[in-house]
A protein has these predicted regions:
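Signal-transducing coupling segments at domain and membrane junctions
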Residues: 69, 78-80, 105-125, 145
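GAF sensory/regulatory domain recognition
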Residues: 46, 56-80
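Conserved nucleotide-binding and Mg2+-coordinating catalytic segments in signaling enzymes
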Residues: 29, 180-199, 220-233
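Short beta-strand-to-loop transition segments that serve as allosteric relay/switch motifs
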Residues: 76, 139-150
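Helix-to-coil/beta transition segments that act as allosteric "coupling" elements at the rims
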Residues: 97-98, 114-138
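Regulatory sensory and allosteric helical modules in signal-transduction proteins
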Residues: 62, 78-109
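Signal-transmission linkers at sensory-effector interfaces
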Residues: 1-39, 50, 179
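Amphipathic alpha-helical "output/dimerization" segments
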Residues: 133, 150-171
């Protein structure tokens, strides 16, 4: 009996170009209302769990060359949020590296770390799709069910379609976060710049006036800072 089925994301798309996909209005609504990347991921995890009638849905994103990180999950708590999944020792790691959607029809037959954890929490099968943005894989979108051999090729095509759509949303939020970091961080010191300092001061003052929340400001006098200004300009370190 088969243990795994592997699908190329492009093949799943090209072979199902005319196939419809139906999404709950609530899913699209709350996704559009999401203000942060974490809200996007939490919304996706919750609604994908419903759409695929899964016992667990999770999302991992690239953390570094060795690990993927579980950023959100819904349902079964086999693998907790913030868990670092070793790429070279996990099923999701293979999905990420190979950029292939893979269905493990019986996780109890796998010795990979995440499959072992799923098995220990009563899961029977899992289906993981790469979050593809162009030629780059951002992470994985994963569903699991307590029954073995539960997911179909049709569901694989649907999950990959949603994963491609969500990957674009994730990429946009990551780009916004990078732009916000550049706009609020001093290049020389790597700490918040004057613009961000003033924004925080205004926010804290507003909280103090409206809610009585106290705050403190510490001032440091740095010796020889004029030399830095003379060398790098007055905008540096501001």
């Amino acid at each position: 009996m088969r243990l795994e089925r592997t699908f190329d994301p492009n093949d799943l798309s090209t072979q199902n170009m005319e196939s419809p996909i139906c999404l709950p209005i609530g899913f699209v609504h709350f996704l559009a209302q999401s203000q942060t990347l974490q809200q996007v991921l939490d919304t996706v995890a919750e609604w994908i769990n419903r759409i695929f009638e899964s016992d667990r849905t999770s999302i991992t994103l690239y953390e570094n060359s060795d690990y993927l990180k579980v950023y959100s999950f819904s349902g079964n708590k086999a693998i907790p949020a913030d868990f670092l999944v070793p790429i070279d020792q996990a099923f999701v790691g293979r999905v990420f590296k190979n950029q292939q959607l893979i269905i493990c029809d019986d996780v109890s037959q796998s010795d990979e770390l995440d499959c072992v954890m799923l098995t220990s929490s009563g899961m029977g099968t899992c289906m993981d799709a790469p979050l593809m943005h162009g030629q780059m894989c951002l992470g994985t979108l994963n569903v699991a069910h307590h029954q073995t051999h539960f997911y179909t090729k049709e569901q694989a095509a649907q999950l990959q379609c949603i994963a491609n759509w969500i990957a674009l949303n994730i990429a946009l939020h990551i780009q916004i976060m990078k732009m916000e970091h550049l706009a609020t961080t001093d290049d020389l010191t790597g700490i918040p710049n004057r613009r961000e300092f003033m924004r925080q001061i205004e926010h804290r003052l507003s909280e103090f006036r409206t809610q009585g929340i106290k705050f403190h400001v510490a001032i440091l006098d740095l010796d020889n800072f004029k030399k830095l200004n003379d060398k790098f300009g007055h905008d540096a370190g501001d």
